[in-house]
């Protein structure tokens, strides 16, 4: 699961030790905390998508349009709270659940459909 992404000339990561979103402008030599709130829950995965960062957490799907400084709820359904990984698949987002199901979204994570 990519807990480290490249976005707008920065490395952005989930620090699993403290659930903070951190960034580096020097290729990971040093890290600066960017988001340390708890309203989104525990971050599980990040993906850059259409100029935003999409995150899956134990509370659902969130997005940031300002490099992870703030996060806006996209989908907090019971199914979205089971997502453990998210991936950019071109024209859609893919998300895998903790029980192995695959979902896709064609509207930047607002709604999800289980792939059969």
Please annotate each region the language model reported.
Residues 4-13, 51-55, 90-95:
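Entry beta-strands of beta-propeller and related beta-repeat scaffolds
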Residues 17-21, 59-62, 99-102:
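Loop/turn residues immediately N-terminal
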Residues 24-25, 64-65, 105-106:
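Conserved Ser/Thr-centered positions that define the repeating blades of beta-propeller domains
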Residues 18, 28-29, 68-69, 109:
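Short coil turn/linker residues within repeat-based beta-strand modules
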């Amino acid at each position: 699961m990519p807990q480290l992404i490249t976005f707008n000339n920065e490395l952005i990561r989930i620090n699993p030790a403290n659930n903070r979103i951190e960034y580096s402008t020097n290729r990971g030599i040093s890290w600066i905390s960017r988001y340390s709130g708890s309203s989104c829950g525990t971050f599980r995965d990040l993906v850059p998508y259409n100029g935003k960062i999409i995150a899956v957490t134990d509370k659902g799907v969130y997005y940031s349009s300002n490099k992870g400084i703030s996060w806006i709820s996209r989908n907090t359904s019971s199914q979205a709270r089971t997502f453990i990984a998210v991936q950019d698949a071109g024209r859609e987002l893919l998300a895998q659940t903790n029980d192995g199901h695959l979902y896709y979204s064609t509207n930047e994570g607002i709604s999800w459909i289980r792939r059969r």
